[in-house]
Design a protein with these regions (language model features):
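Detector for methionine-enriched segments
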Residues: 1-2, 89
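Catalytic-loop region of hydrolases
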Residues: 2-68
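N-terminal cap/lid subdomain of alpha/beta-hydrolase-fold enzymes
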Residues: 49-106
Length: 106
């Protein structure tokens, strides 16, 4: 995994998230969401390639100087994104009224 991250020079502009459903306010950071291709021949359920989904939320202070924190949570699927990123320590919180900034974000 670290080899994959070491090869990334920056998040592609096409992965920049500019709006989220239910969240109408602006936020003081950038959000990227996309897929990283995993090279190699695979014999996994007849697939010939694999991808890993990522979300990058830049620092609210100084993204060029602040350290990059990676967080990996189990899954499978979207449950790990929703539970951890939107209810534990991420920049956003979700409730029955929609999305809002998380005042306790890392």
């Amino acid at each position: 995994m670290m080899q994959l991250l070491a090869a990334v020079l920056g998040a592609p502009d096409g992965d920049l998230v500019t709006a989220l459903p239910g969240f109408n306010a602006s936020w003081p950071f950038k959000v990227y969401s996309g897929y990283l291709s995993v090279p190699g021949p695979f014999e996994l359920n007849s697939y010939d390639s694999l991808s890993i989904h990522y979300q990058l939320h830049t620092s609210q202070r100084d993204p060029a100087k602040d350290p990059l924190v990676t967080w990996h949570q189990g899954g499978p699927g979207g449950s790990s994104i929703n539970v951890g990123l939107y209810t534990e320590m991420g920049y956003f919180s979700l409730d029955d009224k929609g999305g809002h900034a998380n005042p306790f974000a890392w």
